Amino acid sequence: MKVQLIASTILEDPSWAGTDYVGDDETVTSADELAEFAGRNCYLSFDRPNPKTRENVDYLNHILDVGHESVLEHSSATFYIEASRSVLTELERHRHLSFSVVSQRYVDPTELGIHVPPAFTELSGSDADKAKEVLLDVQSFAQEAYEYLVHIFSDAGFPRKKAREAARAVLPNMTNSPMVVTGNHRAWRYVIKNRWHEAADAEIRELAGELLRQLREIAPNTYQDIPTEPYSYGG
């Protein structure tokens, strides 16, 4: 799996549009400070009147406590992700994210590779060998079937994209599906709070953990309440 942050919101106007907002210190990130500015705009509390929420970390902690997460929607983060088709299917259920995904009609997906489900690494000995053999056999068979179907449809006069459109029916869920995904921080928090959980699919849980790690680099106070270990039913 590959997960790489490629874009995020950066503040452009140090004067805060001529308002009376008193900016925090330079260590506060653009995403965290923009969320605070948006929240203070709702109540015109630009001068930080409450000492308990004077610092950005405390202000956003209060925002998270009361569920006023709309202020987190003003900043976004964009990731380049290489993961399986099954992860894409899971991730697309989060409808506030925006996707641009490699086309299986225009691109030969057999050249993109596969992603082995994490459960395979939990096997040992002969079980691991047998499981890996089955997986590789399926990959080989699917690739041969795909190429054969493309050949049949192409010889029948179908354009390449229509041939691939038909042939992709035999591709396994583990097929690599490079994607560009954008979401605001409220949306990303929703993804992580649902997928960074012991009961989640192992591959998307791995994705959620890596997303969390990188999102904390650009918005640490926005994600301050998310645990470093996956959520569990026990707490």
From Swiss-Prot:
Q: Any idea which UniProt keywords this protein has?
A: FAD, Flavoprotein, Methyltransferase, NADP, Nucleotide biosynthesis, Transferase
Which cofactors are named for this entry? Answer: FAD
Domain ThyX, by residue range, is 1-229
Could you say which residues bind dUMP here? 90-93, 103-105, 168, 195
Residues reported to bind FAD: 70, 93-95, 184-186
Q: How is the cofactor bound?
A: Binds 4 FAD per tetramer. Each FAD binding site is formed by three monomers.
Please state the pathway this protein functions in, per its UniProt record: Pyrimidine metabolism; dTTP biosynthesis
Q: Which InterPro entries match?
A: Thymidylate_synthase_ThyX, Thymidylate_synthase_ThyX_sf
* Documented EC number(s): 2.1.1.148
The UniProt catalytic activity note for this protein reads: dUMP + (6R)-5,10-methylene-5,6,7,8-tetrahydrofolate + NADPH + H(+) = dTMP + (6S)-5,6,7,8-tetrahydrofolate + NADP(+)
Q: What does the UniProt record say this protein does?
A: Catalyzes the reductive methylation of 2'-deoxyuridine-5'-monophosphate (dUMP) to 2'-deoxythymidine-5'-monophosphate (dTMP) while utilizing 5,10-methylenetetrahydrofolate (mTHF) as the methyl donor, and NADPH and FADH(2) as the reductant.
Tell me the NCBIfam families matching this sequence: thyX
The family assignment reads: Belongs to the thymidylate synthase ThyX family.
Quote the protein name from its UniProt record. Answer: Probable flavin-dependent thymidylate synthase
